[in-house]
Every structure is written in C-alpha cells, then in structure tokens.
Amino acid sequence: MAKAKYERTKPHVNIGTIGHVDHGKTTLTAAITVVLSTSGGASVKRYDEIDNAPEERERGITINTAHVEYETANRHYAHVDCPGHADYVKNMITGAAQMDGAILVVSAADGPMPQTREHILLSRQVGVPYIVVFLNKSDMVDDEELLELVDMEVRELLNSYEFPGDDTPIVAGSGLKALECGCGKRECEWCGKIWELMDNVDAYIPTPERAVDKPFLMPVEDVFSITGRGTVATGRVERGQVKVQDEVEIVGLNEKPRKTVVTGVEMFRKLLDFAQAGDNIGALLRGVDRKEIERGQVLAKPGSINPHTKYSAEVYVLTKEEGGRHTPFFNGYRPQFYFRTTDVTGIVQLPEGVEMVMPGDNIKVDVDLITPIAIEEGLRFAIREGGRTVGAGVVTGIRE
C-alpha cells in the first residue's frame, strides 16, 4: 500500500476548542477524529493522546498544545486543544496557534462558567473572528427547557463581547456518547451531532485570506550597500508580494513613512521579477542611502501600515519558572518591546484600580513607545528586560 501523499486541494483552516475546564473540549476533539475517520477524513486520536499534549516553546514561553488534523468534504483543518487554562491564555496571546475560528464547548449541564467568559473575552481581544458553539453533555439534561435556557445564556454572553450571539450556530450533543458509539453515521443520534457541528464549522467560519493576498510587508533584518547599485534591505516577506518597480514605504523609527521604489529583487543570489510571503529576499531600493534605513523598520505597500507610539495590548507575564520576573511590576514599568526584528523601550500604564501585575498574570495595558514602530491590531510582540523575555503580548488597538 503506497503512502498517501498530502493533497493540498482543499482550503486550509485553523481552528481550536475553547471553553471552561472539564466541559469536554478534549473529549469532543477525540470524538471529531473518530466520527470523521469513518469517512476517511481523519486518523483516530484517543483522549489520552490529546490530553498528554507535548510541551512547546514559543518566544521562550512553555505551552502545552495538542495538534490534530482532519478533513471534511470541503476543507482541511488543523485543530488545537490545550490541557490547561493557562495554556490557552499563552497560546492565544503569543499567537502560537493562530485560530481562524473556534469551537466553544459549554457543558449543557452547567452552563457558562468563568473560563467560558474569559475565553470569549480573549477571543475578542486577540482577534479570533468566529465562534461556533457545542453544548456538550446534553445527554445529562432531560429537560428541554433547561437546554433552551443554556442556549440563551450563551448567546447573551457572546453578544456582551461583541460576537453575533443571535446568529451563532449552536449544536447540542455529547462528545462522550459519540466517542463511545463511533459508528460515524449521520443518522446516528450522537455521531450525527458531530457531523452537524462540522457542517456548521464548514459553513460559518470563512476560509481565511491567504498571506500572499494581503498587502506587502517585509521586516528589515539587515541592510548593506552594493557599489554602483545602491542599498539593499534583506528580510523575509511577511505577507503579500513585491514586484520590481513597485513603490513601497519604509515605515518605523521615524515620524513619517518614506517612499521609495524597489529596483531589484534577489533571492539566493538570483534576480527575480517578484517575491511573495515566505520568501527570504534582498530588495534593492532606489535613492535610499545606507544610513537612511535600518533593522526594525519595515518595507510595506504605501498606506497599508503606519508608525505609532501608543497602543493597547493584552499581555501575559511569564512566571519565575518560565524564566520571567520573580517580582511584580507597577504602573510606569519601562521594559523593551520586541516587535518583529527590534527592541523599543516603552512605558506601561496599568488599568484603573490595578496596583501591580504579578508573574503569571494576563492583563490589558496601554503602552507608550519612545520611538514610532510599524504596528497594527493583531501584531504580536515580546516584552524583554536586558535581552531576556519576561512577557508576551498582542496589540488590541492603536491609541495614536
């Protein structure tokens, strides 16, 4: 039997299970693999295989995450599931597992709980754009009215965090019953609910825009001059594409962006007509002096990104065990903020009524940088002191 090769004919979407501890996220994840495996769309993953997620390090932060993949008739999915609440917080803030949408698991027997609320809030903050709900353990609820009550409660909760609660698909079922049955038939009382959930995920969570289709951006990693030809900026194209003769802007470290034209693109010492997201390139820039561009700036499609100094962010502060601070920090804390390729000093303003932030906390803060940097909502950064990472964050809004 020849090994099946991975055919990327279907659109790819990243999703994950979120919700309160013990509401059945991991059981549901296992059930999805079992049900989809009956039509050849997945390899069966047992509960304990998912639950014993390996440790990963993302920006110096230890996160336990299980990665499962499966496909429906229309799409290929990469699905993340985390064993502990802290792992979700870290995952969502560092963007270690970028989610195009999430399956919110709520126990029908208990209704929404504190972490249900916190995961919805985090999804709103870090830009998880779509949520589909699975009311799990509904085999334990005999009263139809109780199910309707939980359904209403979840919709109200989603509305309160600016998700369209009234239009959100909610499927009631039981991950455990589907897992125990495993027949995978659509007409089955329990396996059918898993199919219904996946049909809703297929229909409700849109296919994300691919990185190459977004406006061009390349963080500048290094700069050198070629005698007789001009200045070359090197880096990895983060998104979009760039062609020879395209106009671009140099953004960051100065008050205003500066326009220039890309007169050459090279990769592995070969000249190219264009480069796209993922390529490591050197871009030859017209009329730019070696001293007028530096690491920490970005090359971008004109008008697509601006330099800013003031923004709001959701941050996670590393614990002592993770190599972070041993002590809390206070209002006016001045660490370095590492964006893409460079460190910039900034001042932290804590929310009203918050005196201090302890290692292990996650919190919303305002930051004022001393130098403008090309930033936008959704951009991830590290917080450092003397080159050592003490926190991670994501930009949730630009203040000016």
Swiss-Prot record:
Residues 136-139 are annotated as: G4. The keyword Amino-acid biosynthesis does not apply. It is found in: Cytoplasm. It comes from the Bacteria. Keywords: Cytoplasm, Elongation factor, GTP-binding, Hydrolase, Magnesium, Metal-binding, Nucleotide-binding, Protein biosynthesis. Gene3D superfamilies: P-loop containing nucleotide triphosphate hydrolases, Translation factors. Mg(2+) binds at T26. One of its GO terms (molecular function) is translation elongation factor activity. HAMAP family: EF_Tu_B. PANTHER family: ELONGATION FACTOR TU, MITOCHONDRIAL (PTHR43721:SF22), ELONGATION FACTOR TU-RELATED (PTHR43721). This is Elongation factor Tu. It comes from Desulforamulus reducens (strain ATCC BAA-1160 / DSM 100696 / MI-1) (Desulfotomaculum reducens).
